[in-house]
Amino acid sequence: MGESPGLHPYCHGASEATATLDMIRAVREAQALGEIPGMEPDNGELFLTGYSQGGHAAMATHKYIEENNLLEEFNVIASAPCSGPYEITGAMADTILAASYSNPGYIVYIMASYQRVYGDLYTSYSDVLKAPYDEIVEPYFNGNNYTLGMGSLNEQLPQEIQSFVEDSVLENFLAASDDLSHPIWQAMAANDNHDWLPTRPIKMFYCTGDEQVSFQNALVAESTMLENGATDVEAVFKGEGMHNDCVLPSLTDAFTWFESLKTACSLSIEYLEIGDVEVFPNPIQNTFRIETEDFLNSNVSILDQSGRVVYEHQDLTPNCEIDISNLTSGCYFLMLNNVNKSITIKLIKA
């Protein structure tokens, strides 16, 4: 599941955190070497967000930074985890153990991930999964899967955990619900990230109709952190939508919150001179124009909030008009690039 080689360590906090920090270090190094033309100077402020597993990753990264005394290197101004499984042993366990769970593939995914990391959950899928499901799941998690997706796996698994997990495994797992002595419980507990004391602001966005990741994760994390002594932690209600409905309102509000907290970069005169671009109207109904002299003949790209390119245009002409009527409402980023410089401008599609 994914283009990188090997099995992705799903919801393994340490992997999520170290991969994120290594990525930031790599970008800073590339910037220092001048390998990212037109990139704004790094002012040292870090904002963390992510959705679903990305919410778990954002929380894990923030937690890792604070608990390993890395705030001097990674100055977290705020984090905004969205719809993430922060309390895996509680709110998430209650969800997947319910009478019916709409995304049973996640259950196998997390077992496969923790088996890869800890190595003590099983020796083969037949140890933990009933036939024929032990053979069905193998191609999804063999580390060489580039085409099979979670939707396909969910369609092939029953929505009742007792229908595909071996009876003895489930019985032993449930029997250890109080002391968490079962290896699967221990792996889950090692990746809970709701019970710690953040010193930097956190907002956790959630929707109450989320059928994949219980909104109780955010509420439990909020209450636990406040009990631990945190002073700036909040679970933020974003409506009654389901998991996919909650993406845009959550990430849009996270971005808006970050915008209110950031410090404007102290840009050089040279940088200000290359930023002579006018976009109007903005917010945009259907079309907008770009007026510029500095970026004529540039390549034009529009990215959504996940970084996906949703529009491309080459060779920018004077007073160019761009039609984005096919895009849904929300926040986007206009990027203009030529051989010498680049600029990014926030767009709001009404």
Where do the language-model regions lie?
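Short beta-strand/loop motif that positions the catalytic acidic residue
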Residues: 203-210
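Accessory cap/linker subdomain of secreted extracellular hydrolases
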Residues: 82-195
